[in-house]
Every structure is written in structure tokens, then in C-alpha cells.
Design a protein with these regions (language model features):
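Terminal amphipathic helices with adjacent charged low-complexity linkers/tails
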Residues: 185, 189-214, 391-420
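Conserved mixed alpha/beta core segments that line enzyme active sites in large multi-domain catalysts
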Residues: 33, 47-78, 246, 259-328
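Glycine/proline-enriched, intrinsically flexible loops and inter-domain linkers
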Residues: 5, 23, 53-55, 189, ...
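Mobile "lid/hinge" segments at catalytic clefts and subdomain interfaces of large enzymes
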Residues: 114-130, 135-140, 154, 162, ...
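Extended, well-folded interaction surfaces typified by the phenylalanyl-tRNA synthetase beta subunit core
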Residues: 180, 413-579, 718, 770-774, ...
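Phosphate-backbone binding interfaces of nucleic-acid-interacting proteins
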Residues: 1-202, 206, 339, 358, ...
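Class II aminoacyl-tRNA synthetase-like tRNA-binding/catalytic domains
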Residues: 108, 284-324, 328-331, 488-603, ...
Length: 803
């Protein structure tokens, strides 16, 4: 939030520099993201008085002799401007001066005549008419006649000022205004706060009745409105234009400027309804009807539903509550009567409507952080005072103040000095704490038993208990008073990883050893990601938990699979020119027992693996899984299964000890064709994905791996080339071979062949077998017996022949 230094000085007698105030604000918990000097980039620009003028023959230029006081009484400068006259005072950039935008002015010849600087326009100094009158005139900026030659230009045109760009935390919505920051400045400097004038006098009766009602008090705890007749549109005074300009707003008209000024100064959003456009002279705060439409002041049309709070007349919505007014009720040059609105709207209601409609404003930003119920009272009074001060209209006696029935009371907190100091860990004198709280507009009533009855200001909704009081005390007392000390506990527990964390770290290291890089994605995506994977409607993955207030529609549901996010990461890499890669992610997915949810969903730890590139294949992922199995002392079995997003002929399910862990394989061709990547990438890319239930995997691990001595006897190797049907999987063959004998210690597939000589629907798969016995050498007879049994079992169970 931008706060001008000069505006703060209207509330507090500040006797420190802007830089010193920045440090003090930081010390009491307010981060000044940037302190912006208005004269940034301007140097050696002074007031110059034109004492001689002469047209430069044959050119459009005028030769001027300028009196710049101590910098020289006869500085010769040529200019192309034509709006000045003899005796005028103008901004003069001297030789070697700088202007905003990094422009440096040097003495040079203009049309053959030496010019020792430049006479400036308002725009060249970064000014506009709202900051300094006449700045937007075509030509030079003409300064007041009493300007003194040689004076630095900054104070003359109001550039001797600073803008504090302050980050307001969510717990301090009361500081979303110049007044809110001024309260803090007054407290930290120990100065009195000068409140802005809020007195006004009703001068006439209403000319016709107005009906105001609130049908949704749970979303609008307080609604205030005041009727003003005989509106007189005009220009705002210079001081108001300057306030608005310093905060980044342009002046529109006196009445519009008053609503914007009240927002900035008091932190209270306001709106004014043109009563000539309000049907039935009725204002109704209610939930929108299904399908109702509104066109807002920025000419955007929205279709509404009962989740949206609106301000309506007798026929239609005329404003989105807390966000923006409607184009059908806004003021214009023909406006003669206005109803000024100040209200408190529920922050959740404003935030949800703003997000759902994609409509934001300065008002909605404040309501989303919170506007207290006391604020409308101050805001409306200040606005009415300004209306009377600027003679914008005639204030009537008709005012409305509708509430949800709750009394407007200060919060009372019972505390003791010992409790507050106990939270802080230091001793602060009682009177010092009382003084600090009183400077922050708390009242402290010391009870007979020594306890304090502390009343919080009406605008401090964030203060609820004595630890909050401790925070207020230490903010002003100074965090530097807290002396670092060691904990005096009897024992200290050393930190470390627990079993699950160690297993996860081991998993990541095993995959990293296979050249896989870890990815990290958000826990949200949208149904579009599930659609992309062709997941059917009845699949469990479709039972996704919807976010009530999503950041965007693309992040609207909690993930039930990691694969969609992994595929998005792969696509992003391909778009950015990364033609190959290996990735993994270990993260929870969120599974609901039923929808809508009525209990906390199960967060299942899941492992997802992805590999992409022209050289990647099925065995890249399978090899990574085998490395995991070996690392944890497990044996994986593979069965022919697939998933909606995988190629039905190049995929498999992973099992361990009879438990299904997950599925992996090549991305289905039809999904690959739909990816938003270049056609040549689709044709050359191989994308493989795998997703495992990590919790099921860890349940198969039986404690820590222990050292097992290598057999002193060398294993016997045998290769088998087998002919089988296309439907037979590698996993089925491996399982049959291993079950034939305990002597089989290793089975590896090393070749697959298809050819006409094998016959239609046939393929050849070659396996390398290792046979070993830790106690003795395996004899040739034993090898022959095991091989015969393997071939017999393969033929009987799977119809496989030796090639």
C-alpha cells in the first residue's frame, strides 16, 4: 500500500526524516518494501527566471538568458517552447543535470547556437496536473511568480516528498489506510494523532422516501447509507488531487474523488448510487438469484448465483457487494441526487465472489482482508464532511444504519503484567507497558488485585487475548530489548530422521543413481488433467476433492494421481527444448471415502516415475523398479495389466509378495497424439510413466537389509531361447522359471525376436539364467535336471517350446 510522507504529516507532527521513519516502522512490524523519493532521478534542476528572450533566426527556437541565482545570472539556453514570456520562472536543467528516465543534460549547440542546459516541461519532470497545476500544458512548466531563482526545483513543484510502499500483513486490516499507518506512526514517535475532520450538518429534508433493507445480514453485518440532494459536479481542489495522484489515482470529479479519497484515507470502501437510476428508490442487500446478470462499471457482464452478494434496486442488481458498482446506477454529469453507501461485508463472501468472477478492485482487496464494523461510521462521516467542505451537495437528514444485531463493543481482555512479561521472556516496567498500550489507543483499567482490564480499540479485531497484548507491547518497546539466552531445559533431544524419512531418502537416492531427477508439483490440478489421461468417469481417481476457493480453475481439485502432474512436467520440458529426461516424484495423493467429504481424506504416499526421449524404452522404467527392489531386498513380479493412459501392449502391473503396487508402461498413442507439443516431437518421443503405491511398497520391506556373504562358488550360466505366443508376458515366464528350483538365483531377459519363420502370432524371448548353491558347486547333472524341469513347466503352463 502506498502512503505519502506529506499526507502522514497532516495526521502526526513528524520530526524525523523519511528514512528514519522507515526504520521505526520496520522495528514495530511494518515492512516498507520501498521508500520512493518523488524527485528520484532529478539532479541540478533549479528555478530559472527568463530575463532576456530573442527568436533564433531561421529556426523555431528561442534564445533565452536565464537567471539561476547562485548557479549563474546569465545562463544562455535555447528552447523550442513558445508558451513562456519575459519574467516567467521555469524549471531549468543545468549543464550535467539528470532527469527521470536516466536522461542527462549537457551543454551543446542547437542550430549553431550554444545552449547551456534545458528549460523543462512538467512531463519532463515526471509531473501531471494533479501533482502540480500546469504540468500537462504543451510547452514549459510556468512556476509561481514568487519563485526564487536558483532554488532547487523539488520543493517548488512538490517533489520533496516520499512514498512509503508498505506491506500490510493479513492480521492488520486496520492499517489499510493512511489513517491506519498514521496511528502507528503517532504511537512509535510518541506524538498525538490529529484525526481528520468528520463533522457535518444536515441542511435539508429528503424530497422523497428511500427504502433500504438487508436480507443477508450474515454477509453484511453493517450497512450505512446517507442521502445527499442537489449534487453539484465539479473539479476537486488541488490538495485532494495531489493526495490521489500520490497514491496512483487520477482525479475524475469532486464527488467521485471524495469516495476514492475516503477509501485511501480511512480505509473504508464507498459507493454512491444515482437515485434517479435506482428503480423504486429501493436498495436491497441480498444474495443474487440464479442466472441474474450485472454489467459493472468497467463494462464487464457477469452471470450470478446465490453465492454472490449483490446490492439491488426494486428490479435488478446495481452493484457487486464489496467489489464494484453497476454501470446502470453510476453517477454522471446529469446526477442530481446520490445515496452514499458505507458497509461491512463478510470477507469470505467478497473473496469467493471475486475469485469466481475474476473481478478485483481496491475495494475488494480491503474487504478480503477485513473491514471492521466501526469503519463505516467513520468513513461515512468523513465523506459527508468533505461533501459539505467542497460544497458538492446538500446533506439531508435521511441516514440508515442497519446491523446484524450485534452490539458494537470494545473487546475486554483481562491480563496481568506478569503474564505479559512471561510471554515476552523479559521484564518491562508496568507503567511503560501501560503507556505503550495507551499510545495504541487501548484503555487500561488497573484492578484492585493488580490485574488489568484492557479494552481494545473498536478497529482492532485482531486483538483477542493477553499474548496479543504482549505483541503490542514488544512492537513498541523494541525487539532489541530481548536478550538471546540458552534454553534451561533439563534435557535436549538431538534431531534426526525417523524410519519413514530414512526410507524415503533411500528411495530417492536409489532413483538418483539411475539418473532420475526429482520433480515437485502442486497438490492441485483440474478435471482437464484427468480427461487428458482418458480416465473413465467411474474410476476411483475421479472422486477428487474440490477446493472451495481455488487459486484458479486449473487448480480446482486435490490430486488423486501423480501421473497427470508428471505428464505436464514432461510436456513443459519438451516445449522448452529438453528432448530427454528421467524424473520422479514422491508425494501424497488425497483419496476421499465419499463425496462430499465428511472426514479427513486419506493421504497416501505415492511414487511416480517418468522417462522421455528417443532412446528411452519400457526397460528404463522397469530397470529403475528393479533397482528399487534390489535396494530394499525385494523381488518384484510383473503381470500383463494396463491403465487408461498406457499402451495396452507395452505396460505391466508390479507385484510384491502378492500385493499390487502399481502399473507402468508407455503412454498410449492416442494420448501422445493429443499432447500440445510439435508433431516431430510426437513422432520421435517415447514417453514412459509409472505410478506405485509407496505405502504398499514399504509394507513389503522387512526391516533393515543385513549383510549376506557372497557364495564362494561361481554360478552356472545358461541361456534359453523360447518361442511363445504374443499373449505370454515376460513376467509370467520369469515367475515360472524361478519357481522351478531354488537353485535359480537370477533371470534376465536379453532379447525379443519376431519373424516369419516363427509363425504368425509367435515371438522368441531369450533369457539368461544363473544357477548357484551357496554351499557347493552346482554339478552339470543338477543344471541339466533344473533346465529340463523349467522347460517342462513352461510347456505345460504356458505352451512354450525351446527354439
Amino acid at each position: 500500500m502506498k502512503v505519502p510522507f506529506s499526507w502522514l504529516k497532516e495526521f502526526v507532527d513528524i520530526d524525523v526524516t523519511a528514512q528514519e521513519l522507515e526504520e521505526k516502522l520496520f522495528s514495530c512490524g511494518f515492512e516498507v518494501e520501498e521508500l520512493i523519493p518523488l524527485d528520484a532521478g532529478i539532479s541540478k534542476v533549479v528555478v530559472g527566471k527568463i530575463v532576456e528572450m530573442e527568436k533564433q533566426e531561421g529556426t523555431h527556437l528561442t534564445k533565452c538568458v536565464v537567471d539561476c541565482g547562485a548557479y549563474g545570472h546569465e545562463i544562455r539556453i535555447s528552447t523550442g517552447a513558445a508558451n513562456m514570456k519575459l519574467g516567467d520562472c521555469v524549471p531549468t536543467a543545468l549543464d550535467g543535470s539528470t532527469l527521470p528516465g536516466g536522461i542527462t543534460i549537457k551543454a551543446r549547440k542547437m542550430q549553431g547556437v550554444e545552449s547551456n542546459g534545458m528549460l523543462c516541461s512538467g512531463a519532463e519532470l515526471g509531473l501531471n496536473d494533479d501533482l502540480f497545476p500546469g504540468s500537462e500544458v504543451y510547452g514549459l512548466l510556468i512556476l509561481p511568480e514568487d519563485s526564487v531563482p536558483g532554488t532547487d526545483i523539488a520543493p517548488v513543484v512538490g517533489l520533496d516528498d516520499y512514498i512509503f510502499d508498505i506491506s500490510i500483513t493479513a492480521n492488520r486490516p486496520d492499517c489499510q489506510s493512511v489513517l491506519g499507518i498514521a496511528r502507528e506512526v503517532a504511537a512509535v514517535l510518541g506524538k498525538p494523532l490529529h484525526m481528520p475532520a468528520m463533522d457535518y450538518k444536515a441542511v435539508c429534508e429528503p424530497d422523497a422516501p428511500i427504502t433500504v433493507k438487508v436480507e443477508a445480514p450474515e454477509l453484511c453485518p453493517r450497512y450505512m447509507a446517507h442521502y445527499v440532494r442537489n449534487i453539484r459536479m465539479g473539479e476537486s481542489p488541488r490538495w485532494m488531487k495531489r493526495h490521489l495522484a500520490l497514491c496512483g489515482l487520477r482525479s475524475i470529479s469532486n464527488v467521485v474523488d471524495i469516495t476514492n479519497h475516503t477509501l485511501l484515507e480511512m480505509g473504508q470502501p464507498m459507493h454512491a448510487f444515482d437515485l434517479n437510476k435506482v428503480a423504486g428508490r429501493t436498495i436491497d442487500v441480498r444474495r443474487a438469484h440464479e442466472g441474474e446478470k450485472i454489467v459493472t462499471l468497467d463494462e464487464k457482464e457477469f452471470t450470478l448465483n446465490p453465492n454472490n452478494l449483490v446490492i439491488c434496486d426494486a428490479e435488478k442488481p446495481v452493484a457487486l457487494a464489496g467489489i464494484m458498482g453497476g454501470a446502470n446506477s453510476g453517477m454522471d454529469d446529469n446526477t442530481t441526487s446520490l445515496l452514499f453507501e458505507c458497509a461491512t461485508f463478510a470477507r469470505d463472501s467478497v473473496r469467493k465472489t471475486s475469485r469466481a468472477l475474476g473481478q478485483n478492485s481496491d475495494s475488494s482487496a480491503r474487504y478480503e482482508k477485513g473491514v471492521d464494523r466501526y469503519s463505516p461510521q467513520l468513513g461515512l462521516a468523513r465523506a459527508l464532511h468533505l461533501i459539505q467542505q467542497l460544497d458538492c451537495g446538500d446533506i439531508t437528514t435521511l441516514e440508515y444504519d442497519l446491523t446484524d444485531g450485534r452490539p458494537l463493543e470494545r473487546k475486554h481482555i483481562v491480563a496481568t503484567p506478569a503474564k505479559i512479561c512471561g510471554v515476552l521472556g523479559i521484564t518491562v516496567p508496568d507503567q511503560t507497558m501501560i503507556d505503550i498500550l495507551q499510545r495504541l489507543e487501548f484503555t487500561v483499567d488497573v484492578q484492585a488485585d493488580g490485574s488489568w482490564d484492557v479494552s481494545a480499540p473498536l478497529y482492532r479485531d485482531d486483538v483477542e487475548s493477553f499474548p496479543d497484548l504482549a505483541e503490542e507491547v514488544i512492537r513498541e518497546y523494541g525487539y532489541d530489548h530481548i536478550v538471546p539466552t540458552f534454553l534451561n531445559t533439563a534435557s535436549v533431544t538431538n534431531g534426526g530422521l525417523n524410519y519413514d524419512q530414512k526410507q524415503q531418502l533411500k528411495t530417492k537416492r536409489l532413483l538418483a543413481a539411475q539418473s532420475f531427477y526429482e520433480a515437485s508439483t502442486l497438490a492441485f490440478y483440474s478435471n482437464a488433467e484427468l480427461d487428458m489421461l482418458h480416465i473413465p468417469a467411474e474410476d476411483e481417481a475421479r472422486k477428487a476433492i474440490r477446493i472451495l476457493n481455488p487459486i484458479s480453475e486449473n487448480l480446482s481439485i486435490m490430486r488423486t494421481l501423480l501421473t497427470p502432474s508428471m505428464l505436464n512436467v514432461i510436456v513443459d520440458n519438451l516445449k522448452k527444448g529438453n528432448a530427454e529426461g528421467r524424473l520422479f516424484e514422491m508425494a501424497p495423493v488425497y483419496l476421499a471415502k465419499e463425496l462430499p467429504i465428511n472426514e479427513h481424506p486419506h493421504e497416501r504416499q505415492t511414487l511416480c516415475i517418468g522417462a522421455f526421449g528417443p532412446e528411452e524404452d519400457f526397460f528404463t522404467v522397469k530397470g529403475a523398479l528393479e533397482a528399487l527392489a534390489a535396494g530394499f531386498g525385494l523381488t518384484f513380479d510383473y503381470q500383463r495389466e494396463t491403465a487408461a493412459w498406457l499402451h495396452p501392449g507395452i505396460s505391466a502391473a508390479v507385484y510384491c509378495n502378492g500385493k499390487r503396487l502399481g502399473v507402468f508402461g508407455k503412454l498410449a498413442n492416442e494420448i501422445n497424439a493429443e499432447l500440445e507439443i510439435a508433431k516431430e516431437q510426437k513422432d520421435s518421443q517415447n514417453i514412459y510413466l509409472g505410478e506405485l503405491d509407496y505405502e504398499a511398497l514399504m509394507s513389503c520391506v522387512e526391516g533393515e537389509l543385513r549383510y549376506k556373504p557372497l557364495s564362494p562358488h561361481a554360478p552356472v550360466k545358461r541361456d534359453l531361447a523360447l518361442v511363445c505366443g504374443e499373449a505370454v508376458s515376460c513376467g509370467e515366464i520369469e515367475e515360472t522359471i524361478r519357481k522351478a528350483s531354488p537353485l535359480v538365483s537370477e533371470v534376465k531377459l536379453f532379447d525379443i525376436y519376431r519373424g516369419a519363420n516363427l509363425g504368425e502370432g509367435k515371438k522368441s524371448m531369450a533369457f539368461s539364467l544363473s544357477l548357484s548353491d551357496p554351499k557347493k558347486e552346482v554339478s552339470a547333472e543338477e543344471v541339466e535336471r533344473v533346465v529340463k524341469k523349467i522347460l517342462s513347466n513352461l510347456k505345460f503352463k504356458l505352451g512354450i517350446e525351446i527354439r
